[in-house]
Amino acid sequence: MSRTLVLVRHGQSEWNLKNLFTGWRDVDLTEQGHAEAKAAGQKLKARGLKFDIAFTSALSRAQKTCQHILDAVGQSDLKTIRDQALNERDYGDLSGLNKDDARKKWGEEQVHVWRRSYDVSPPGGESLKDTGARVWPYYLHDLQPHVLRGGTVLVAAHGNSLRALIMALDGKSGEEIVKLELGTGVPVIYQLNADSTVASKEVLEG
């Protein structure tokens, strides 16, 4: 039984490039982002991975990343579930703002707290804790059963929705998880035990 879970943050988006808060806004990948997603697929192909099912968010940057990966491994038509439970953290009133402009409006310290604290949310938005409150139950109910049946499951999503998953899988604290940097288009491969605990973890960087 493989019991394999592969997490991939979407490739660079147009708003990543412009240093804007993105959240639930639906923006496209950059040329570099498409290349990162294709490269992720090639890394997974080189490992000989074949997926039983794929999950992604309701946002096109994650969906396109997912499709690039499936194309690379020769599974373009694989069943793919799209659900907003895997969407990026909702940045509320910060969405669409340049991060430097947000610092000018609210102050460097306040914006830093909103971005890098675990349980403080920006106006009208979600904290990382809030994001985890929708991501983890979705994982337990919809994703994990496929893995525990011996499947190989792809999840193409976002920096903060994946942080929320990794926090629970790795047993990290809120303080630890906010410091975790997830590269765009970098696959993280988990092997799970039959009791759902983590047997191994590998990050395919470079």
Curated annotation (Swiss-Prot):
- EC number annotated for this UniProt entry: 5.4.2.11
Indicate the residues that form the catalytic site: 10, 88
Q: Give the InterPro entries listed for this entry.
A: His_Pase_superF_clade-1 (IPR013078), His_PPase_superfam (IPR029033), PG/BPGM_mutase_AS (IPR001345), Phosphogly_mut1 (IPR005952)
Q: Which cysteines share a disulfide bond? A: none
- State what protein this is by name: 2,3-bisphosphoglycerate-dependent phosphoglycerate mutase
A GO term (biological process) for this protein? gluconeogenesis
Gene3D superfamilies named among the record's database cross-references = Phosphoglycerate mutase-like
Q: Describe its function.
A: Catalyzes the interconversion of 2-phosphoglycerate and 3-phosphoglycerate.
Q: Which keywords appear in this protein's UniProt record, sorted alphabetically?
A: Gluconeogenesis, Glycolysis, Isomerase
User: Cross-referenced SMART domains, in alphabetical order?
Assistant: PGAM
Record-stated family? Belongs to the phosphoglycerate mutase family. BPG-dependent PGAM subfamily.
Write out the GO MF terms.
Answer: phosphoglycerate mutase activity
Question: Could you tell me which pathway this protein works in?
Answer: Carbohydrate degradation; glycolysis; pyruvate from D-glyceraldehyde 3-phosphate: step 3/5
Catalysed transformations (reactions): (2R)-2-phosphoglycerate = (2R)-3-phosphoglycerate
**Residues that coordinate or bind substrate:** 9-16, 22-23, 61, 88-91, 99, 115-116, 159-160
- Assembly and oligomerization: Homodimer.
Q: What class of enzyme is it?
A: isomerase
Q: Which NCBIfam families match?
A: pgm_1 (TIGR01258), PRK01295.1 (NF002339)
